[in-house]
Design a protein with these regions (language model features):
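CE4/NodB-like, metal-dependent polysaccharide N-deacetylase domain
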Residues: 1-17, 96-111
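Acidic, His- and aromatic-enriched active-site or binding-groove loops in soluble protein domains
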Residues: 8, 29-50, 54-63
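The substrate-binding groove and active-site-proximal loops of carbohydrate-active enzymes
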Residues: 8-16, 74-89, 118-125
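Active-site-proximal loop/turn and secondary-structure-junction residues that shape catalytic pockets
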Residues: 17-19, 39-42, 69-71, 114-116
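Distinct, well-ordered alpha-helical segments
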Residues: 21-29
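Active-site and substrate-binding clefts of carbohydrate-active enzymes
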Residues: 52-53, 57-62, 66-69, 81-82, ...
Length: 197
């Protein structure tokens, strides 16, 4: 449908709440996608950095782009929080944080939902002015922007990423427990799956 309507076929997949595990990655790869966006969860990465391209351990053809949750949440959650120790956040300061990362780190992925603009961050917070200024401040530091498709096309994976259990960008746990964390949720989930079988 996308190809028919827009003349383009998507090459990178983004699941709701960035939910991912190895099995999901294998399914996404089998659908022909070349990359997938997911969370840079510490409990999965361990000592690894989210600033590199990884690949699915069940299909090395699927590259994984991991969200830098701190930098993403600085915009989507904390930007207008006057209690935050970095408030107010200006584009030049934000770009200086990105510029401070080691040169060898391949990519810094900033992912957020559009509902952050206007809901989590009211327009009165000057979020739009911040976003407009970002490319200019980045250009001054020699920092460039790329689409996910450009990244998975240009960059090689440095390693496979093993994710046996689902992870997401939700809550501190960065997993799916918020949806299956109590008896009622699990019962509804199991009923739904029993109907499918």
């Amino acid at each position: 449908k996308m190809k028919q309507m827009f003349g383009k076929a998507p090459k990178v997949f983004r699941n709701s709440s960035l939910i991912y595990n190895d099995e999901i990655g294998a399914m996404v790869a089998s659908m022909g996608f070349k990359g997938m966006l997911t969370e840079g969860a510490k409990h999965v990465l361990g000592w690894k950095s989210p600033h590199y391209v990884y690949h699915c351990n069940m299909n090395p053809n699927l590259k994984l782009l991991l969200r830098d949750f701190k930098l993403s949440d600085d915009i989507s959650l904390r930007f207008s929080n006057s209690e935050w120790n970095e408030y107010p956040l200006f584009a030049d300061k934000y770009i200086s944080w990105i510029d401070a990362f080691p040169q060898e780190e391949q990519v810094i992925n900033i992912f957020m939902e559009l509902c952050s603009l206007g809901m989590s961050q009211p327009l009165s917070s000057n979020i739009l002015e911040f976003l407009k200024a970002l490319p200019y401040c980045a250009k001054e530091k020699g920092i460039t922007f790329s689409t996910p498709t450009e990244i998975v096309t240009k960059l090689k994976s440095v390693s496979q990423l093993d994710v046996p259990y689902p992870m997401s960008w939700v809550d501190e746990e960065r997993d799916t427990s918020c949806w299956l964390g109590n008896v009622m949720q699990r019962e509804a989930f199991n009923k739904l799956y029993s109907v499918a079988e």
